[in-house]
Curated annotation (Swiss-Prot):
It catalyses: 5-amino-6-(D-ribitylamino)uracil + L-tyrosine + S-adenosyl-L-methionine = 5-amino-5-(4-hydroxybenzyl)-6-(D-ribitylimino)-5,6-dihydrouracil + 2-iminoacetate + 5'-deoxyadenosine + L-methionine + H(+). NCBIfam families: CofH family radical SAM protein (TIGR00423), F420_cofH (TIGR03551), PRK07360.1 (NF005609). Its cofactor is [4Fe-4S] cluster. This is 5-amino-6-(D-ribitylamino)uracil--L-tyrosine 4-hydroxyphenyl transferase.
Length: 359
């Protein structure tokens, strides 16, 4: 395998799989990815001042990797109405956040109009403070809410966009293979449905992120299949702003408790995912985000030297990783984020949701 040639060529799915299977050239793969990263985006590492608002942890979903959901009767359950969500968004804006990420569980009472009310109230309450970028609702949430009020996805997305939705998180992707999905999230939208929601969003002016959750029951071939689907969508729509690998946090997940998964990904796989995704995507998808919440600061810093060029955000409130067993905190100050970047000789730059730099 001629790794040097991979710096320039648009590698095939077969070559991508060979990289995942390669056990002899680990550090060489990381170096190739780092060279591509430097050529593509330089030594700038971006971050965003943001807040996560999870408006409910009650969910009818059956995802076997999720430790966040509860039943309505659970004393730890919560459900924030649109006014409460707006209050949290205002607090985030006053604290300096330029982005708020809003997500919640799946319930019959959560329809597109409920989502639109959240957006409208967040937009209105933050307007006199310069507004805030609203990054909200996964493809699964959009589809479920649309079905709850008899709309199709395109109709729902128009209502959400008109109500203030700027971008969407490309979560609920997990692994884009229906055999795997039937095992880990049997009632979630299918691969083709996820693709449809995302493409429809892109074609109607709503950009999204894209994600991949790895380190559970998938095989290397499924990782390649997933990355290939994302790459083909990006070639068609140019609608992804970033790729976010999400390492599976196993400790509190049902998959772990029922014995399907003994542990999550190794540190080697974590770094290979960042490196190989950089080599595979090249300039089709320039921004690859490392997750300090899931990886911790030190491994995230290493990932900045093998493909990643963004460290995500300050978060301010992040409940899902914490519930799953994440042990690296759920909030980081801007100063700490910048130091995390500076300490690996990179240049920190603040950005907004669309990766436009902020002075």
């Amino acid at each position: 395998m001629d790794l040097i040639s991979f710096k320039e060529k648009d590698i095939s799915k077969k070559e991508c799989l060979e990289l995942f299977l390669d056990t002899e050239n680990f550090f060489d793969i990381l170096k190739v990815a780092d060279d591509i990263r430097k050529e593509s985006v330089g030594d700038t590492v971006t971050y965003v001042l943001n807040a996560n608002i999870n408006f409910t942890n009650v969910c009818s979903g059956t995802c076997k990797f999720c430790a966040f959901k509860t039943e309505k009767e659970d004393p730890n359950s919560f459900f924030l109405n649109p006014d409460k969500v707006a209050e949290k968004a205002l607090l985030a804006r006053k604290t300096g956040a330029t982005e708020v990420c809003i997500q919640g569980g799946l319930l019959p009472e959560i329809d597109t109009y409920f989502q639109a009310e959240i957006l409208q109230k967040v937009k209105k309450i933050t307007e006199k403070y310069g507004g805030i970028d609203i990054h909200a609702f996964s493809p699964m949430e959009v589809k479920s809410a649309a079905e709850n009020c008899g709309l199709n996805v395109k109709e729902a997305l128009k209502i959400l966009k008109d109500s203030g939705l700027k971008t969407m998180p490309g979560t609920a992707a997990e692994i884009l293979n229906d055999e795997i999905r039937n095992e880990i999230c049997p009632t979630k939208l299918t691969t083709s449905e996820w693709i449809d929601v995302v493409k429809t969003a892109h074609k109607n002016g709503i950009k999204t992120t894209c994600t991949m959750m790895y380190g559970h029951i998938e095989e290397n071939v499924h990782l390649v299949e997933h990355l290939s689907i994302l790459k083909e969508i990006q070639k068609e729509t140019s609608g992804f702003t970033e790729f976010v690998p999400l390492t599976f946090l196993h400790e509190n997940a049902p998959l772990h408790h029922i014995g399907k998964v003994k542990s999550g990904a190794s540190g080697i796989l974590d770094l290979k995912v960042y490196a190989i995704s950089r080599i595979f995507f090249k300039n089709y998808l320039k921004n690859i985000q490392t997750s300090w919440v899931k990886l911790g600061i030190k491994l995230s810093q290493i990932s900045l030297n093998c493909g990643a060029n963004d460290v995500g955000g300050t978060l301010m409130e992040e409940s899902i990783s914490k519930a799953a067993g994440g042990s690296f905190g759920t909030c980081m100050s801007e100063e700490k984020l910048k130091n995390m970047i500076l300490n690996v000789n990179k240049i920190p730059k603040k950005r907004n949701t669309l990766y436009e730099l902020i002075n």
